[in-house]
Amino acid sequence: MSQSPIELKGSNFTLSVVHLHNDQPEIILQALQEKVEQAPDFLKNAPVVINISALPADADLKALHHAIDSAGFRIVGMSGCRDEQQRRAVIKASLPLLSEGKKQKTSAKEDKPAEPAIKKTRVINLPVRSGQRIYAQGSDLIVTSNVSAGAELIADGNIHIYGMMRGRALAGASGDQECLVFCTHLNAELISIAGQYWLGDKIPTELAGKAAKLSLVNNELTIEPLI
């Protein structure tokens, strides 16, 4: 029996979500270009989801699409549609519409709190080389060796690096803002928690190459030394 020329499979990808708070294409273009200039290797031609929940229903989505594309981003889906008018506008603009699960109604009866799920931890005991990408889906990630520039660590949970960190670390990739990044020798190109990120030049000079912990406080990255 001949093999089918195509095969559809489910998969998981880490995508950034761009929340638009302005419907003027020129303003969006300038803001995105500034972001790309800050981290060209990370953001140029990056696939993104566009959230339009803050935009008016009559926003020109075609013009916004052109602005986002011109800035070097590639739209893989639109989210945040508040009503049918916005959904029709997305479809009319020939943009992919992502379906979002409906929130479950709260039961009148108080259910017993579920036991917290035990997270598995992915452990990497070898050096992570430039160009390598490691993703710990649904778990924490521990690296016990060095991470080279150009390497990328991604985890839905926390990230621990027990070695020299020169690459990129993205914790809380599924949106968990309580995730942390721990590093014994911090010289990262980029650190991100739940989509909020710092480039390497944002790391305080007194902590460069030192042991540090990064977390989110009021939706902003903060850093403190590890004693």
From Swiss-Prot:
Keywords recorded for this protein, A-Z: Cell cycle, Cell division, Septation
InterPro entries, per the entry: CAP/MinC_C, MinC, MinC_C_sf, MinC_N, Septum_form_inhib_MinC_C
Keyword set includes Amino-acid biosynthesis: no
Similarity field: Belongs to the MinC family.
Function: Cell division inhibitor that blocks the formation of polar Z ring septums. Rapidly oscillates between the poles of the cell to destabilize FtsZ filaments that have formed before they mature into polar Z rings. Prevents FtsZ polymerization.
Biological-process GO terms, alphabetical: cell morphogenesis; division septum assembly; regulation of cell division; regulation of cell septum assembly
Name of the featured protein: Probable septum site-determining protein MinC
Lineage: Bacteria, Pseudomonadati, Pseudomonadota, Gammaproteobacteria, Enterobacterales
Subunit structure: Interacts with MinD and FtsZ.
Pfam families: MinC_C, MinC_N
